Amino acid sequence: MLVSLPLLNKGLFVSMSELLQFLQQRNSAPKLIAPAPSAEELEGIYRAALRAPDHAWLRPWRLITIAGDRRQAFGELLEQCLVQRSPDSDEAARAKARNAPLRAPMLVVPVVTLSEHPKVPAMEQRFSAACAAHAILLAAEASGYAGIWRTGDAAFDRAVMTSLGLGFHEEIIGFLYLGTRDGQPKSIPQLDTADFVSSW
């Protein structure tokens, strides 16, 4: 059976076995360079994210993009929030925070928007947003790009969230760095499924 991913790979048809192999080989790319996905490619990537598992169709997520000069502004924000959290931070730590957004040509910040629901607890809504984030990484890879999911203290800092426009009922799921892989994919040891799967 062949499947087509027209928005992700411009109409290339792949077999289901090739698709499965792609999923089995995906890995994170800590070193990213330009270009980032185009506007058209991002549309396809975001559409993949919108198909995340979503109990009761709450759609408990939204996405914030940071690209171009806004990365530098975001780095300055991260530095300011670091100093607020840790006034004794040295210059190396401050520089690391300031330069973090410059490690890729763009960032996507998945946000979970929590709501009260009798059948969908907050944790399940967070899971849904995390699935959307994972779908972005997979779709970016399918589009010929790469990415890495990072968190760190900034992801849990309410000052960072407020500065990004999050409400009290919203949280950052992570920072997705997207771009073109710089170099060859790193070698990852093959895991044995028997170490992770059991029968009851």
What are these regions (language model features)?
Residues 103-109:
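A structural motif
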Residues 5-103, 200:
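N-terminal amphipathic, basic helical "cap/leader" segment at the start of enzyme domains
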Residues 49, 108, 114-163:
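Small-aliphatic-rich amphipathic alpha-helix that forms the alpha element of a beta-alpha
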Residues 69-73, 79-80, 114-116, 158, ...:
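Short, charged/polar surface micro-motifs in flexible loops or helix N-caps
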